[in-house]
Structure formats: C-alpha cells, structure tokens
From Swiss-Prot:
GO terms under biological process: division septum assembly; FtsZ-dependent cytokinesis
Location in the cell: Cytoplasm
Family: Belongs to the ZapD family.
Biological role stated in the UniProt entry: Cell division factor that enhances FtsZ-ring assembly. Directly interacts with FtsZ and promotes bundling of FtsZ protofilaments, with a reduction in FtsZ GTPase activity.
Pfam family name, one: ZapD
Presence of keyword Cell division: yes
Keyword Cell cycle: yes
This protein's UniProt keywords: Cell cycle, Cell division, Cytoplasm, Septation
Protein name: Cell division protein ZapD
Gene: zapD
GO CC entries: cell division site; cytoplasm
Length: 250
C-alpha cells in the first residue's frame, strides 16, 4: 500500500488453489511485517496470522497442490524452449530453481507441524477466539515472554519463520511465475460492467486509477469472469458510462 501511487492493484483468484495460495501469501507477509514483536499489538497481529495460517494449512493438502504446480511450471518453461530467440539460459535457470524448490518441499516435514507443536503458539491460538482473551491475566506466559531479552525472542521467532521457509519459497516462485504470465492491457467497462472469457487462467490482476474512487466486484472461474465497478461512496458516488482500466489474465 502506498499513498504515492496513482493506481490501485486488485487481484482475484479464478480457482480454489489460487485463492488458498493468495491467503497464505497474505498471512506470510503479515508474519514478516510484524516479526519484531515490539509491543502487545504487533505480537497479537503476529500470533493471529500464525493461527490463521495454520487454519488454512489444515483445510487441504497444500503441499501436494504446490508440488503439482511446480511440475506444471517446469513443463510450461519446457515449451518455451521451442520458441525462436528465447533466452535459454534463463529458461534453464528457472527450471533448476523449480526442481530445487520441489525437492526441498517434498523433503520438508508436514506443513506447519513445527508451529502446531510449539507450546506458546498453542496457548495463544487457544485464546485468540475469545474477545480480549489475550490480556495478561488470561495469558501470563505470553506477557512474561514479551519481557524476555530481545535476542531470545528473536531466536524463537526466527525458528518459527524458518520452519515455513520451504512453503514460502515455493509459493513465492509459483505466484511470481503466474503473475508474470499475463500482460496488462487497457479495457473499457460500459456503465460499470465488463465481462470476458478467462481461458483457463488462474488469476485476474486489475489496475484502476485511484482518482475514480471506485472498486471492482469480481466474480468468475477458469472459463469466464465478470467485473462490476462500484463507488466507494455508495450514496453520492458516480460510475462513468465508460471507464478505462488495465487487466491482466494470468
């Protein structure tokens, strides 16, 4: 997020696996942004992100889906080998990275298991569902731990984040390749509505000028999608008859 940018980027997943991956990416970013745990607020944000990440990981076989996607991306890169003028050194480098990530992910323990077995995480996770349930009288262990020397806390936090490294590295690579597979092109909505074919895409990326004070409401799946633009101010906002925006189908 940046106030300096004149455009806003929106992303919408077109299948369940991409939806899960974007949620994991978002939670991973929250963990790394709040890992310093300088106060109770940042600590609760950090532990809440861990709890939500574990919930997401427990809903499906994330590792299997990532391994399938790493293999699929390798095959896609292999197809580029037949294109005249393609940078073969770059292709080989990316394929090696994908193979290494696949091997590391396959050898890693169960996703999130190290975090599930941690006593402090378990206690905090149990109390997060209770409104205000992480007060010092509810969780004296957390209150005491936050007053431990910074070096000791950082050492433990590093071990938590490091346990997620195989997951994060594989996911970062996959999402980067998916995002770069689509090119932004100018599109125009009529009376706030736009629809098109998705062509088995995984992800929609939409750039919109901030000055319009609009946001997109997107629905769709791997074959077709629809976008409706709505005003931030639902009472006094205006939707132009023709609105230009940029869209990438990835």
């Amino acid at each position: 997020m940046s106030d300096a940018s004149s455009t806003i980027l929106f992303e919408y997943p077109l299948n369940e696996k991409t939806r899960t991956w974007l949620r994991i990416e978002s939670l991973s970013q929250q963990l790394h942004q709040n890992h310093s745990l300088t106060d109770m607020g940042s600590a609760l944000t950090f532990f809440r992100a861990i709890a939500e990440l574990l919930d997401v990981l427990e809903r499906g076989d994330v590792r299997t889906e990532l391994l399938k996607e790493l293999e699929r991306q390798q095959q896609k890169l292999l197809q580029w080998s037949d294109v005249p003028g393609v940078d073969m050194e770059r292709i080989h480098s990316l394929r090696r990275q994908l193979k290494d990530l696949s091997s590391t992910l396959m050898a890693a323990p169960r996703m999130g298991q190290f975090l599930r077995e941690d006593r402090l995480i378990g206690m905090v996770r149990q109390r997060l569902g209770i409104p205000g349930g992480c007060c010092s009288f509810d969780l004296p262990t957390l209150h005491s731990w936050l007053h431990q020397p910074k070096e000791l806390r950082e050492q433990l936090v590093f071990s938590w984040l490091n346990s997620l490294s195989p997951l994060k590295q594989a996911l970062d690579m996959i999402l980067e390749l998916i995002r770069h597979s689509g090119t932004f092109r100018p599109q125009t909505s009529l009376n706030g509505f736009f629809q098109d074919n998705a062509s088995d895409a995984d992800l929609l990326r939409l750039r919109l000028e901030q000055m319009h004070q609009l946001y997109p409401q997107i629905s769709g799946h791997k074959t077709r999608y629809a976008i409706r633009f709505l005003p931030l101010d639902s009472e006094n906002g205006h939707i132009p008859p023709r609105l230009t925006f940029e869209l990438a189908c990835c």
